[in-house]
């Protein structure tokens, strides 16, 4: 939970709106990432709809046994996303899945682009 709070605080700091895992479960979702972004962000050129936070190190065995299937379910339901393994990621895994960005820290502000939200009246609001 500590790392989830760090993630949520980082998202608030950049002005991102999001639903938490608790919010998603209240909507009836069973398998959920830690946050679903209400408006996607771009991180290093990749569109991110959801973020999961792991208080662990990711090596090929950990990724295959516990992450790979779980993240595919999130991609199928919510679109592409990002997983933060706070204790590191083996470099070879960072580009394994084009729909799941694996990182070891919340991205720096310079690597994040806030995407526009389109309002019902046709106007858009940049964040």
Model-based region annotation:
Residues 1-26:
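Acidic-basic catalytic patches of nuclease active cores, encompassing PD-(D/E)XK
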Residues 26-28, 90-91:
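Short secondary-structure capping/turn micro-motifs that flank functional sites
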């Amino acid at each position: 939970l500590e790392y989830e709070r760090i993630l949520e605080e980082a998202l608030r700091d950049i002005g991102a709106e999001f639903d938490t895992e608790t919010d998603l479960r209240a909507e009836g979702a069973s398998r959920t990432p830690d946050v679903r972004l209400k408006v996607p962000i771009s991180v290093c050129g990749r569109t991110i709809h959801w973020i999961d936070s792991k208080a662990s190190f990711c090596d090929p065995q950990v990724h295959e046994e516990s992450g790979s299937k779980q993240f595919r379910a999130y991609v199928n339901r919510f679109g592409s996303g990002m997983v933060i393994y706070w204790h590191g990621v083996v470099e070879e895994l960072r580009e394994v899945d084009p729909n799941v960005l694996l990182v070891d820290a919340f991205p720096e502000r310079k690597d994040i682009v806030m995407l526009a939200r389109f309002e019902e009246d046709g106007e858009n609001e940049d964040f």
